Amino acid sequence: MTEEFNESMINDIKEGDKVTGEVQQVEDKQVVVHINGGKFNGIIPISQLSTHHIENPSEVVKQGDEIEAYVTKIEVDEENDSGVYILSKRQLETEKSYEYLQEKLDNDEIIEAKVTEVVKGGLVVDVGQRGFVPASLISTDFIEDFSVFDGQTIRIKVEELDPENNRVILSRKAVEQAENDVKKASLLESLNAGDVIKGKVARLTNFGAFVDIGGVDGLVHVSELSHEHVDSPEDVVSVGQEVDVKVKSVEKDAERISLSIKDTLPTPFESIKGQFHEDDVIEGKVVRLANFGAFVEIAPGVQGLVHISEIAHEHIGTPGEKLEPGQQVNVKILGIDEENERISLSIKATLPKEDVVESDDATTQSYLSNDSIEDNPTLGDVFGDKFKDLKF
């Protein structure tokens, strides 16, 4: 009965079967295995011992090890009643690896793997077999030199499996994106308008700067970069620069965060505190004209108002009669309102009063400058016979 059973097992072993056995001998280029229930011994060539490259079979097996493998070929010498099973342990390992990776792909799970090689197009990793992380799937950020990952254990997700073509595509970027999504949701919940936090400039555009505030980018509009006018964001900040930002608004549904660098900086008015005082006479530049007066810049970003009545001693209809933008003028500080950050200025107070009257009529000048009424000429003296033909 026992002999019939064993004979049946022997006859049932065929190519493609999975068998078990014990390592009997480890040679330079192959391993000899006693197959359980087999008529012959099995041979595993070094190329079929592992999914990894090895120089010697002793790197992965030793005598007495129990192993499992696929029968890839049966060579029989009927004349001598002998033969050998050609086995592949690598094929079995690859199959198990694909089963494991498929499960991780189906469940969108993260796995850890060691980077075994850095190549031009990405990273080669060990996931029980050769896996590949393309350059485009390495990170959400730009990485110039991939060699920093060489030998490192990284967290990845399975992106694509193709057993027929022995193709395993993995993504480290997907893990970062998932982590960033969690961070973003948490940050959006915790942020409030008015919060002042630290960040790092991530990228620049024509309309502002995006600042990373902990895995989430917020926008600092160009108008919020400085108290002064900014033509280009790169004139004020640079990528990688650490900055303090104030949260202006948080749109949780749209996942948008508006930030300000300007609001964390001293205002131009605060920066001149103690520098100017009432009655000081200083130089400034006319920057803008309005119907009611002229705005004069007395320090970078600091403007004061010269009311139209303080432009000249004589009456003028519009500031444009005496001033133009860009003109340098002397002004006297009439008052400083620190609470409202306003400065009242006067040009008139810096001008001598004798400069007020401008006339080429010598007689009129004489009339205005003479204190003696008796010595003053009459209208008749001034205009002579010019009234004689007038009829009243």
Curated annotation (Swiss-Prot):
GO molecular function, one term: mRNA binding
Residues annotated as domain S1 motif: 16-90, 108-173, 194-262, 279-348
Source superkingdom: Bacteria
PROSITE patterns from the UniProt entry: S1 (PS50126)
A GO CC term attached to the entry: cytosolic small ribosomal subunit
Alphabetized SUPFAM superfamilies for the sequence: Nucleic acid-binding proteins
Keyword terms of this UniProt record: Repeat, Ribonucleoprotein, Ribosomal protein, RNA-binding
Keyword ATP-binding among record annotations: no
GO biological process: translation
Pfam families associated with the record: S1 (PF00575)
Its biological purpose: Binds mRNA; thus facilitating recognition of the initiation point. It is needed to translate mRNA with a short Shine-Dalgarno (SD) purine-rich sequence.
Family as reported in the entry's similarity comment: Belongs to the bacterial ribosomal protein bS1 family.
UniProt-recorded name of the protein: Small ribosomal subunit protein bS1
Organism field: Staphylococcus haemolyticus (strain JCSC1435)
Lineage: Bacteria, Bacillati, Bacillota, Bacilli, Bacillales
